[in-house]
Structure formats: C-alpha cells, structure tokens
C-alpha cells in the first residue's frame, strides 16, 4: 500500500487518502479536469494571499454542548456575513466530499458508531476511542478544507466546532471511565503533532446552555440513542469548555459567549462581531510567505492526515495486516473507487484512453 492506515487503524491509508479526496499525481494527468495545485511559481508570479484577504476573511467557530443550537446560529451568521458555512464534521465527512457523497459502510469509516457509543459507551471493543479518534481526523480534514477555502477565495468561513475544541469530548469520556489513560496519551500525541500547523479561529462563539436544559432538548428531539446520554457526561463536556477551552482560546482569538436565549438573535450576534477589533492572535503575525506555506499544507490532504498515524500500539485503533489488505481490496471494488475520478468504466467514464 502506498500509504499508512487512516490514524485509527480501521482502514488502509490508501482508502483513507481516497476517502479524504487526496490523490497522488502520476504521469501527466490525474483526472479529466485540470487540477493545477497552488505552488511556488504561482506565488512568485503574484498569486499571494494579501491580494484576496480582507477584513471579512475570518474563521469563526460556533461551539457548545450537545443540542445547543450551534448549527442554526452558524448557518444564520454565515448567511448574514456572506461567509461559507461548514456543518459539523461527522463520521461520514470524508464520504460527503468524495465520490457520490453517499455514506459508506463502517469498515471504511473508522469502524466506529456514534449510536453504539450512546448505547454502550463502555463497550470493551474499543468503539468509544475509535469514534473520538476518527472524529478528530474528520475535523482536521474539515478545518483544512475551511482554511483552503479562505486562502483561495478570501471568503470567510463559519464552522461548528473544530480541532481546537474536539478535546472536550475526550476529557468527558475519560472522566466517565469510557476510555483508558493510554487512549488519552495517544490522542494528545496525535494532537500535538497535527494542530501545531494550523492557525486558530479569529473568533470563537460559545453557546452556554445549562445541562438540565440540554437534557430537555435531547428528550424533545426524541433520538432514542441520544436520550441515553447521562447528565454527568454532559456536565464534563461543559466543564472542559469553561475551564480549559475558553480560557485557552481567549488568549489566541476573540471569544463571544451567549446564553441559549441570546443565541437565538443572530442579528445581535452579527452586530457584536462587527464591533470586534480582532487585535490579537497569531493571524496578525502572518504575511504572504507564511500564508503561502499554510496554503501548500491545507491543499495537500495526504499531508494533512499524515501525522494522525503514529507508531504507537493501541488495541482500540490497531488492526492486522490481513484485515487491512481485505478492507483495501473491498474498498477498491466499490463503484468508482478503483481509479481516480474519470477513469472508472463501471460508473460510465468514457474515452479513458484519451485522457
């Protein structure tokens, strides 16, 4: 195989790269479309970030506990500011941006299940940590997509959660005894070698909804799996947000905090955003050269995901070579997945010999 396993050891690295939309160029053509990547010559010829980034080129993340209205607020903010909205990255985020966009089987998505986590968070098959590790990789991929969009178009982006807040779930899982200390160490090691390459958001918006209200909303929503979430787990998520995440992010970027009622008034939130000075954080220290290197990174999805695979044995996310080979071959047998887009006759691609 050309690549390593996708961070979680659930699928082959080749499967992971294809699922993430990253393809190595071979020969002259890699697809039927021209996909000239941004590089040194375009930079030297004048294609620089300063020409497209404006005061509206911002990265905004909306955070909060489960069922706090993050998606609704994020979408409304994006619409009012003219930003691009990125819905929260889930297990099937790689599927949503590749192929026909349809979700693939669990074998190709970390071999984990959110529903199973809600039903049995202490399952001894390692599902809980596989889920968390896979979701971190999905959020990492999405954050790179958001930064790539920002640097390529100059348009601001709004995300629901990010790689910077992902750890709140890990903390809650560990505090509740769902995962082992070795899993926490593995996660922190992966995070330390990946998150350091990325600039934090310009702004974090936190929706503060008390745990009893969160539980009431979950019951009203009626999802039979979510309804099994305990108040202790939700409280640990809130504690991680308030005691660790918000204090850390307040040193790196702007932070706005709203109650459940205040978050419903997106017009007022947008007004508050427009009054912010955005006078702190690492974005202020960037220039064309540093943004050039950042753009090179985020456009290369292979490199984005590369360091989420580390040589540490952890039963929860490790599989054998035979299983890896089997999953890889099964993936390659799926329609349109054997070769690069445009080169698969089984899905109707034609004139391949001319490409």
Swiss-Prot record:
The keyword Electron transport applies. GO terms for biological process: mitochondrial electron transport, NADH to ubiquinone. Binds 1 FAD per subunit. The modification N6-succinyllysine is found at residue 285. It is found in: Mitochondrion matrix. Its cofactor is FAD. The modification Phosphoserine is found at residue 250. Residues 1-35 form a transit peptide. GO terms for cellular component: mitochondrial matrix; respiratory chain complex I. Its main location: mitochondrion. Phosphorylation at Ser-250 by PINK1 is required for the binding and/or reduction of the complex I substrate ubiquinone. Keywords: Electron transport, FAD, Flavoprotein, Mitochondrion, Phosphoprotein, Respiratory chain, Transit peptide, Transport. Pfam families: dNK. PANTHER family: DEOXYNUCLEOSIDE KINASE (PTHR10513), NADH DEHYDROGENASE [UBIQUINONE] 1 ALPHA SUBCOMPLEX SUBUNIT 10, MITOCHONDRIAL (PTHR10513:SF15). Belongs to the complex I NDUFA10 subunit family. Complex I is composed of 45 different subunits. This a component of the hydrophobic protein fraction. Accessory subunit of the mitochondrial membrane respiratory chain NADH dehydrogenase (Complex I), that is believed not to be involved in catalysis. Complex I functions in the transfer of electrons from NADH to the respiratory chain. The immediate electron acceptor for the enzyme is believed to be ubiquinone. This is NADH dehydrogenase [ubiquinone] 1 alpha subcomplex subunit 10, mitochondrial. It comes from Pongo pygmaeus (Bornean orangutan). The lineage of its organism: Eukaryota, Metazoa, Chordata, Craniata, Vertebrata. The gene is NDUFA10.
């Amino acid at each position: 195989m050309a690549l390593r396993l996708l961070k979680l050891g659930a699928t082959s690295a080749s499967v992971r790269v294809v699922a993430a939309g990253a393809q190595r160029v071979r020969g002259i053509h890699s697809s039927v479309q021209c996909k000239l990547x941004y590089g040194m010559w375009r930079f030297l010829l004048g294609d620089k970030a300063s020409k497209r980034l404006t005061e509206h080129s911002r990265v905004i993340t909306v955070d909060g506990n489960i069922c706090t209205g993050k998606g609704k607020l994020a979408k409304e903010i994006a619409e009012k500011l003219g930003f691009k909205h990125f819905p929260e990255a889930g297990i099937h985020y790689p599927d949503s941006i590749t192929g026909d966009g349809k979700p693939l089987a669990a074998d190709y998505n970390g071999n984990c299940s959110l529903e199973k986590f809600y039903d049995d968070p202490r399952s001894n098959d390692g599902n809980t940590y596989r889920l968390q590790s896979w979701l971190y990789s999905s959020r990492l991929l999405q954050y790179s997509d958001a930064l790539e969009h920002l640097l390529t178009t100059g348009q601001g982006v709004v995300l629901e959660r990010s790689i910077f807040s992902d750890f709140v779930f890990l903390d809650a899982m560990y505090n509740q005894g769902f995962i082992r200390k070795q899993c926490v160490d593995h996660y922190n090691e992966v995070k330390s070698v990946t998150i350091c390459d990325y600039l934090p958001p310009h702004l974090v918006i936190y929706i503060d909804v008390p745990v009893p209200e969160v539980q009431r909303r979950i019951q009203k929503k009626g999802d039979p799996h979510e309804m099994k979430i305990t108040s202790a787990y939700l409280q640990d998520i809130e504690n991680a947000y308030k005691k660790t995440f918000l204090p850390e992010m307040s040193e790196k970027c702007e932070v706005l905090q709203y109650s459940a009622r205040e978050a419903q008034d997106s017009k007022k939130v947008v007004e508050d955003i427009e009054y912010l000075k955005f006078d702190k954080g690492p974005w202020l220290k960037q220039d064309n050269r540093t943004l050039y290197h950042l753009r090179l990174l985020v456009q290369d999805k292979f490199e984005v995901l590369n360091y989420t695979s580390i040589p540490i044995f952890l039963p929860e996310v490790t599989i054998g070579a035979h299983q890896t080979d089997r999953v890889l071959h099964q993936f390659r047998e799926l329609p349109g997945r054997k070769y690069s887009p445009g080169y698969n006759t089984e899905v109707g691609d034609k004139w391949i010999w001319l490409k």
